[in-house]
Each structure stands twice: as structure tokens, then as C-alpha cells.
Regions:
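A short, flexible loop at the N-terminus of ABC-type nucleotide-binding domains that lies
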Residues: 2-32, 41, 56-58
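ABC ATPase nucleotide-binding domain signature region
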Residues: 48-127
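Conserved ABC ATPase "signature" region
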Residues: 112-119, 137-154
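Catalytic Walker B motif of ABC-type/P-loop ATPase nucleotide-binding domains
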Residues: 183-187
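ABC ATPase nucleotide-binding domain "signature motif"
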Residues: 162-169
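Conserved ABC ATPase signature
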Residues: 128-131, 158-162
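Hydrophobic anchor residue at the start of the ABC signature
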Residues: 172
């Protein structure tokens, strides 16, 4: 019998005014992928945040992943909005936030932010590389993944200056540099053109075959 990788039981999420999720239960077998459809404000993002431990909930969420060497890399959540620290570490920013020239100079570039993530995950044994390459330098790995989603020309651009579509691609690259056991995507196709959607689908199919659930 195939093992279950995720078990959600009687999940309830409340705000001060509303019950956002009320008694949600489901399970996901290992090697299964899941797409959740629904209108805006129907609770899809709330469910993702509950699974990744970003919000308080009642009920239970159990995850069971095998062959994982780094616990924090088990689950990766690509959100609609990505916040980040400036280089001096004093402020939080997000894409398309109002900024002045000082903010741009103090914001990390795409490459700097990806290199930081890569280094944090460097203890893992496997890194995703387009074309199935076995090894590569940190820079080559990052550049290859940037290129496949069409933003390699922006690698030295400050994050705060990216458009919505560019920022979505950056977030996807960030998750794909070192694929987790579970990848949760919130509206992944927003801001992508048709060619980029096809490329992303190919990447997701590739990492799914290699053990990442989506």
C-alpha cells in the first residue's frame, strides 16, 4: 500500500471576524500531485500557509517525507508576494513597493538573493539542473535556472525594481535551485507568457519525476 505523504484532518483557520477554512480534511499519497481550484478569497492561500506553518490553525497536519537530508528543505511555498531584507538588514521590502534611489542601492540583486539561498541549501546532496547535469558551480546552477525562465538578463537587477511577472519568475527560480520534497505554488502562472508557462510545466514535470510533490 502506498504511503501517505500529507494528512490534513479537521483543519480550521479563523480570523477575528470569519472562519476561513472549516473542517478541511484530505490526504496525499507519495508521488501524487494536487491542484486546488477556487475563486479569489476561497481559502487556497490560507490552506498553503497552514501547511507551511505560517499561520495558526486547529486540527492536524502531518507530513511524512522520505530521503530528506535537510528538514527545512522539505516544504517550499512560492507566495504571490515575496518580502526580503535590504542589504543592511534593517527593513523589509516587497516587489513594486515605493522606493527611492537609496532603497534600490540597498536592496539585494536577484543573483545575490539566489546565491544566499543556494548556500543555505548547500548541505543537501542534489541540486536541480536543467538537462539532468550532475554537478555545476553555484553560479552555473543559478544562471541555468534563470535562463530557462527567461530572466537571466536581470540577474544583477535589484529585487525591488522587478515587475510583478519578473518577480514571480524569480520566486520560481528560487524554489527550483534546490527542489524541496513538497513545492506549493500560489497562482504560479500569473505574470508568465505562454512560452514561460510551457517551460515551467516542463520543469515541474521534471522535478516531479525526481521526487518533488507539487
Amino acid at each position: 500500500m502506498q504511503k501517505l505523504s500529507i494528512i490534513v484532518k479537521d483543519l480550521v483557520v479563523r480570523t477575528q471576524e470569519n472562519i476561513v477554512l472549516d473542517g478541511i480534511s484530505f490526504s496525499l499519497k507519495q508521488n501524487e500531485n494536487l491542484a486546488i481550484l477556487g475563486n479569489s478569497e476561497s481559502g487556497k492561500t490560507t490552506l498553503a500557509k497552514a501547511i507551511t506553518g505560517k499561520i495558526h490553525f486547529t486540527g492536524s497536519i502531518v507530513t511524512n517525507f522520505e530521503d530528506t537530508t535537510v528538514k527545512h528543505a522539505r516544504i517550499e511555498f512560492v507566495e504571490q508576494r515575496y518580502s526580503f531584507k535590504n542589504l543592511s538588514g534593517t527593513n523589509d521590502f516587497y516587489y513594486q513597493q515605493r522606493f527611492n534611489s537609496f532603497d534600490a542601492n540597498d536592496a539585494p540583486t536577484i543573483f545575490e538573493e539566489l546565491l544566499k539561498v543556494y548556500e543555505n541549501d548547500s548541505k543537501k546532496n542534489h541540486h536541480y539542473l536543467p538537462g539532468g547535469q550532475a554537478t555545476a558551480s553555484k553560479a552555473d546552477n543559478i544562471n541555468s535556472t534563470l535562463e530557462i525562465l527567461g530572466i537571466d538578463h536581470l540577474k544583477n537587477s535589484p529585487l525591488i525594481q522587478l515587475s510583478s511577472g519578473e518577480h514571480k519568475r524569480f520566486q520560481l527560480v528560487k524554489a527550483l535551485v534546490n527542489p524541496p520534497k513538497l513545492l506549493i505554488l500560489d497562482t504560479p502562472y500569473t505574470g508568465l507568457d505562454i512560452l514561460s508557462v510551457k517551460k515551467l510545466n516542463n520543469i515541474l514535470g521534471d522535478i516531479s519525476e525526481k521526487g518533488t510533490q507539487i
